[in-house]
Structures are given as C-alpha cells and as structure tokens.
Amino acid sequence: MKHFDHIVFDVDGTLADTEESVLSSLAQIIQEETGKTLPRHELDFALGIPGKDALEKLEIYSQATLDRWCQVAASFKSTISVFPGLLEVIATLADSGCKLGIVSSRARNEYAKEIAPLGFDKYFEHIILIEDTTEHKPAPAPMLEYLRRAGANPGNVVYVGDTVYDEQCATSAGVSFARAAWGSHQDIPNATYNLKTPNDLLTLTTK
C-alpha cells in the first residue's frame, strides 16, 4: 500500500455519524414544504452534497427553506457523534506528524454549531468548507483548494470519504481515494482503498 503525507477527510459519514440529523431534519422540511412524507431511503442522495443542491433536487429550494433546514438540523445535534475509535486514531496520526485536513460540503455556520463541538478541529491544519470554493463536490475544486493551501503534491494525498461524490472529487483532483466503510452505505468501485475500520487509517502513512 502506498503511504501518504496528507490524509484529508470528509465529515458527514466519515468523521461524524450525522445521518440521523441530516435525514430526519430533511424529512421534516419536506413535510413542512410539501405535506409529503418520503421514505427514508429516498433521501439518502442528500448525504454528502451541499444542502442547497439537495433542496434543488427536491424542487423546494429557497434561502429561507435552507435556513429553516439548518435550524431544524440543529435540533438533532444530540444525535451526532464521532465514529467509535476515530478520535484516537486521528490523534495518533497527528502525533506521528501526518498532515490532516478536511474537505466538506458543509456551510461554515453548520460546521461551527454541529461539528466543531465534537472536538477534532485541533488536529486539522486546513478545513475546506462550502464557502471556500464556487464549485463543490463532486467537482475537484474543494480538493484543489486544499492542495493549494497545503502546498501539497496530489500524489502525496489521500481523501477519505463515504460517497461517490467524494471519490469523484478526489479522482478529478488527482488524489487517491479511500472509502470509509464504517460510515458508507454506497458501493464505490473506483475507490483506491477500502478501509473497514478507523484503525485501517494507520496503514495509509508511515509517519
């Protein structure tokens, strides 16, 4: 296995188990906007893409609706947690000198309210969020922005994520991709690596 100097993480479904928060709040918004109750599996597409894009696909986007979704999602904050064992592995990687980053489709205010309190920000030198680029996953722009800020060679970087959008973003930017099987519900045939547990992250670096 190739060893990398930089390990970059997606947030939702990779670092943090946010599925209940995202999908339950989205279901509530759809109910409010349309009066319909959609089956949970029909909402899975919203995992890993910007909220605006999800609402546009559902044909219910407005800034007010997006703001309302953020408000409702915050009420599910107690359901969000770091995947078991992951914080310890991240600390080990950071202590060993591996450079860690985040590339996420979350907005900065959502991240600050729901994700930052989980306590892993101190390990990440660069955190790329939706406001940092004009194009978003699956486009390569967010990863390219990480590479620019970190001064990193794409060949020395691996992106860990849970969706096809993550893989497409990484591949388009010339970066290797590792599927976080502990949070992924998707088959990702083009993944370079398939990590079954957080401990498998330690195999990605010699540092």
Kindly label every feature range from the protein language model:
Residues M1-D5, A94, R108, A112-K207:
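Asp-based, Mg2+/Mn2+-dependent phosphohydrolase catalytic module
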Residues K2-E88, A94-S96:
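N-terminal helical cap/lid subdomain that shapes the substrate entry/recognition surface
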Residues T14, S104, D162:
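Conserved G/P- and acidic residue-centered "switch" motifs that form tight phosphate/ATP-binding loops
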Residues D17, I102-S104, R179:
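Hydrophobic residues in well-ordered beta-strands that form the structural core
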Residues L26, V89-I115:
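Substrate-recognition element of Asp-dependent hydrolases with the DxDx(T/V) motif
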Residues E42, I80, I102, N156-V158:
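Residue-level marker of alpha-helix boundaries and capping positions
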Residues G85-V89, P142-E145:
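Well-ordered alpha-helical segments embedded in enzymatic catalytic cores
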